[in-house]
């Protein structure tokens, strides 16, 4: 526990093109070694691919994808009387978004398409259609929470 109290949350500035804080957070999540320009280029190219292939507004597709990826429940290990229980808990809204973005980028990187922008675009489109690895991760998380519902009374 920190002695000086909780660290204040930094306000994220919306990105200049789509004017969305969620897009900025995705750029930050994509960024490697502080190369924000490269991360921005990858994301905007992915959005161009989405617009080209779906004909819809890329930001709407992305927000729909995020809605389908963000988990509502997760399990947390609690030690009670010498044994560990996986206790299902509700996910806070800020953590929901963070997990959604993390899974989106993680499973985009594992895909087989040629460029990262293609991988990201395909994963976003899959997530918007309720398919893809990131949505599967959310479903697995929910299944795990559902399977451990018996331990829900250990929540505190």
From Swiss-Prot:
This is Small ribosomal subunit protein uS7. GO terms for molecular function: rRNA binding; structural constituent of ribosome; tRNA binding. Belongs to the universal ribosomal protein uS7 family. It comes from the Bacteria. GO terms for biological process: translation. The lineage of its organism: Bacteria, Bacillati, Bacillota, Bacilli, Lactobacillales. One of its GO terms (cellular component) is small ribosomal subunit. Keywords: Ribonucleoprotein, Ribosomal protein, RNA-binding, rRNA-binding, tRNA-binding. InterPro entries: Ribosomal_uS7 (IPR000235), Ribosomal_uS7_bac/org-type (IPR005717), Ribosomal_uS7_CS (IPR020606), Ribosomal_uS7_dom (IPR023798), Ribosomal_uS7_dom_sf (IPR036823). HAMAP family: Ribosomal_uS7_B. Part of the 30S ribosomal subunit. Contacts proteins S9 and S11.
């Amino acid at each position: 526990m920190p002695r000086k109290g909780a660290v204040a949350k930094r306000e994220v500035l919306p990105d200049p093109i789509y004017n969305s804080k969620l897009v900025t957070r995705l750029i930050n999540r994509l960024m490697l070694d502080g190369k924000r320009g490269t991360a921005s280029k990858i994301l905007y190219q992915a959005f161009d691919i989405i617009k080209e292939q779906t004909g819809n507004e890329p930001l709407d597709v992305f927000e729909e994808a995020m809605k389908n990826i963000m988990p509502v429940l997760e399990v947390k290990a609690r030690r009670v009387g010498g044994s560990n229980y996986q206790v299902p808990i509700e996910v806070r809204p800020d953590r929901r978004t963070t997990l959604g973005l993390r899974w989106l980028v993680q499973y985009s990187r594992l895909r087989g398409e040629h460029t990262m922008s293609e991988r990201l675009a395909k994963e976003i489109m899959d997530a918007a259609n309720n398919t893809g690895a990131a949505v599967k991760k959310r479903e697995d998380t929910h299944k795990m929470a559902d399977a451990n519902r018996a331990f829900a009374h250990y929540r505190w």
